[in-house]
Amino acid sequence: TRGGAYDVSGTGYQPEGDITLEGKTARLAQHGHLHALIEVVAVANDTHVAEEDGQWKVTGEPTEGALRTLSHKAGFDAETHERHASIPFESANKFMATLNTAPGGQRRILLKGAPDRLLDRCRQELGAAGELEPLDRAFWEAHIDALSAEGLRVLAAAAREVSASKDALALEDLEEDMVFLGLIGIIDPPR
C-alpha cells in the first residue's frame, strides 16, 4: 500500500502469524491502508478456511485461501459485510468483484485480481495520508515487477463507494473510477 510494505509471517492456512510494518506489529485500527486492502481480499472471496481434525483446510481456491488466512491473522471479520451482488472470477477478466454493505452502512464495490486489469480501471489511488490521489501507474508497475522478481504471485485490490440504493453489479460498473488500494504478494508453492 502507499502506507508501507507490510510483512506477514506464518505458513499454510493456519491463522497464526503477525502482520508487521517496519518490524512493528500492525493493527487494522491504526492502519487504514491495510484495513482497506484486507477488506477487499476478505470480502470479495468465496473460499473458506477451517480447522478439521487439527489441520487447517481450504474449501475453494488455494490463493483465495491464503487471502482468507491473511484476513484471519488481521482479525478482520468478512461476515459483517452484507453481499448484494458479485461478478465471479473468469479467466477472460482476471478479477472478481462484489457489491457489499459494510457494518457502518457504506455500500462499496470491491475488486481484486490481476494488477494490470485493476490498474486499467483506476484513476485514483489511496494516498499515503489516506487521501485520494491521481493514480501513479509507474509506481505500482515497479512494485509489481519487484514482487514478481521475488517469485511471488501478485494480486491487486481496488474499491469505490456507490449509492446505498445500488443493488446490482455489472462489468460496466468496473470500467473506471475504481480507487487502487495496493498489492499483495503471495508465495506460490510448487504444485
Give residue spans per PLM region.
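Conserved cytosolic headpiece of P-type ATPases
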Residues: 1-191
